[in-house]
Amino acid sequence: MKQLRLEPVVQVRGEINIPGSKSISNRALLLATLAKGTTTLTNLLDSDDIRHMLASLKQLGVGYRLSQNNTVCELTGLGGAISADTAQTLFLGNAGTAMRPLCAALTLGRGEFTLTGEPRMEERPIGDLVDALKQLGANIMYLKNEGFPPLTINATGLNGGDVEIAGDLSSQFLTALLMVAPLAKGSVNIHVKGELVSKPYIDITLALMAQFGVQVINHDYARFEILAGQQYVSPGKVLVEGDASSASYFLAAGAIKGGEVKVTGVGRLSIQGDVKFADVLEKMGADIEWGDDYIIARGAPLTAVDLDMNHIPDAAMTIATAALFAKGTTTIRNIYNWRIKETDRLAAMATELRKVGALVEEGHDYIQITPPAVLNTAEIDTYNDHRMAMCFSMMAFADCGITINDPDCTSKTFPDYFAQFASLKA
């Protein structure tokens, strides 16, 4: 197994241009596919999740051209649903942002489609989405365990009508349903059951749908109306914002050991909720400066916070490791959906934080972290989870440094993360 040793860093300073957002990249690729016209996507993320989506689209007959560095994609839309004359099997790795939307999109046309992935994907639930699609007439069959991939879709199109979908596990289910609803045979009325988690991710979806010419009537996130007869039309160009979750590590670095760190590609005008991570750092005592398309974090003594972070679940992980450098006990609440991500992130985070000496209380949907007087070095297991590897890079700011096991798992969203991180040393 590959290991990466991070030696202690005294101070950080610098500027990082954040690679494209995973959430926006895969949503935009799918909408461009369903749209009429050719779309040029710039600052597309070049990572495993996006490669799985692109490979699947190519297999389904979608035409596109990629630039040499894979960050510009010119894609010719189908002007409607995806159909196939022969049965197709698509391998989607551990890419939830490809599995969920494609599962929904492939019900719209005609054909037989089987969706598979890595072993971890077979543990990531999809039942809430499938149940909703079945209410609109979809024919979907599980191949192993009820409620989980792999699955086979026999597509004949989606009916309109009323549909209920659970909102309390993952916003990706609602996102997938919203994106396909305009191409159903009639108007669709979506009722959200339970508390909707990660609302800002729904805002990303609605903003992109509007960019492609489709309007959704949002009744305070409890009900969504999508009128029949709408069509996605390419806006011509789509600029993919920098990934706000990826920005969180560099902003935390600036807060803990700045100096001053500036991230570009996200800012005040961002459509991603995870930029609110900077507000949490500010509450902890960091000096934060906002621009339209940049955020600057400067170092200051940090103090613990006790916050509901349901709205920023991915970036909240960075707070868990930043808490090691804050005075007092930090509590991160309402984050049950950490448990159904690339790994059970609540259990994984608690285990690894204890290795470096933290006192940790792990609850059903919260984590409480009290830093030790002196942090210990350790070998951090990353659970094939890109965010675990990036979060624990913060331990480079302890006097003992840290060893990261399987550092290349960052390829899911940020292949050159550790090279960029190293560039910040003052």
From Swiss-Prot:
Q: Keywords, A to Z?
A: Amino-acid biosynthesis, Aromatic amino acid biosynthesis, Cytoplasm, Transferase
Metabolic or biological pathway: Metabolic intermediate biosynthesis; chorismate biosynthesis; chorismate from D-erythrose 4-phosphate and phosphoenolpyruvate: step 6/7
Q: Which GO terms describe its molecular function?
A: 3-phosphoshikimate 1-carboxyvinyltransferase activity
Q: Which one GO biological process term can you cite for this protein?
A: amino acid biosynthetic process
Listed binding positions for phosphoenolpyruvate are K22, G96, R124, Q172, R345, R387, K412
Q: State its location(s).
A: Cytoplasm
Q: Which reaction does it catalyse?
A: 3-phosphoshikimate + phosphoenolpyruvate = 5-O-(1-carboxyvinyl)-3-phosphoshikimate + phosphate
Provide the Gene Ontology terms for cellular component: cytoplasm
Keyword Cytoplasm assigned to the entry: answer is: yes
Protein EC: 2.5.1.19
Q: Where does 3-phosphoshikimate bind?
A: K22, S23, R27, S170, S171, Q172, S198, D314, N337, K341
Query: Which superkingdom does the taxonomy of this entry point to?
Result: Bacteria
Top-level class of the enzyme under EC nomenclature: transferase
What this protein is reported to do is described as: Catalyzes the transfer of the enolpyruvyl moiety of phosphoenolpyruvate (PEP) to the 5-hydroxyl of shikimate-3-phosphate (S3P) to produce enolpyruvyl shikimate-3-phosphate and inorganic phosphate.
Q: How does it assemble?
A: Monomer.
Give the family from UniProt.
Belongs to the EPSP synthase family.
Q: What is this protein called?
A: 3-phosphoshikimate 1-carboxyvinyltransferase
Q: Which species is listed as the source? A: Shewanella sp. (strain MR-7)
Q: Which gene encodes it?
A: aroA
